[in-house]
């Protein structure tokens, strides 16, 4: 089961993988402290920095230290972030940290931010998009936003279409009320494969569907479904695609998974 997020094992095994010519930027997530947003004179701070300082400063999500209010989190973009090689991942991490360091230094020059400090940051740059498998079925954006329930659906996804196009604009399309996307087992199986599955960001899907499928909860659901399919296939001596879908769903349900409508 390839859970690399980059379809690395699928590629090494000789299965076809797909990638966009231009991929979405990555993000380095961090938290700031040492200032009070409500006391800042925003007229003296360039507008482009307001988002970083304001991020998630809602009354019900404030986190209080003994001295200052911490921003729950914010992020900087890392264009071209790539985690498919050690070299690329290192470059993305270094670029993210350099961008963040320059930002912190700049923010500290503004009135009210003299004591601003970096509280913490993620250990690595988060990568949104690399390779996807060419699976038995490629989920598309309409499948996702319509909440189509596939006959071989094994898990759900909830996130909106969320394509970070160039680091400056985001295309989003939220699911309508009572619509929940489902993920078919076929999208976890590479074409021409026998005893192989994937789970996570490298699921077989078009770019827009993948922009929603890539998040953690969806990946966890795919991982559990792929594991169950693999166990049943191994016990029965057949390929994952040949396992009865109701057996997969029953075992998932036994272990507490939230599964799409029973066939």
Residue ranges of predicted features:
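Flavin (FAD/FMN)-binding glycine-rich loop and adjacent Rossmann-like elements that form
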Residues: 4-263
């Amino acid at each position: 089961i390839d859970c690399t997020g980059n379809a690395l094992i699928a590629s090494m095994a000789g299965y076809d993988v797909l990638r966009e010519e231009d991929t979405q930027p990555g993000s380095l997530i961090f938290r700031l402290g040492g200032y009070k947003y409500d006391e800042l004179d925003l007229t003296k701070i360039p507008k482009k920095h307001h988002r970083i300082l304001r991020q998630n400063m809602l009354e019900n999500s404030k986190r209080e230290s003994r001295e200052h209010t911490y921003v729950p989190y914010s992020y900087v973009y890392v264009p071209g972030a790539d985690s498919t090689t050690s070299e690329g991942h290192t470059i993305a991490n270094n670029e993210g940290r350099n961008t963040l360091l320059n930002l912190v230094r700049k923010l500290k020059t503004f009135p009210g931010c003299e004591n601003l400090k970096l509280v913490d940051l993620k250990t690595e740059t988060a990568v949104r998009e690399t390779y996807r498998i060419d699976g038995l079925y490629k989920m598309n954006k309409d499948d996702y936003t319509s909440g189509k329930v596939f006959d071989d659906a094994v898990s759900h996804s909830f996130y909106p279409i969320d394509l970070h196009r160039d680091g400056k604009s985001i295309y989003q399309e939220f699911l309508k009320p009572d619509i929940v996307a489902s993920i078919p087992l076929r999208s976890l199986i590479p074409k021409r494969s026998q005893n192989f599955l994937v789970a996570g960001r490298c699921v077989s899907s078009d770019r827009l569907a993948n922009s929603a499928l890539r998040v953690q909860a969806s990946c966890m659901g795919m991982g559990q479904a792929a594991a169950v399919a693999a166990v049943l296939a191994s016990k029965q001596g057949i390929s994952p695609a040949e396992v009865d879908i109701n057996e997969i769903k029953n075992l998932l349900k036994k272990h507490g998974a939230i599964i799409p409508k029973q066939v």
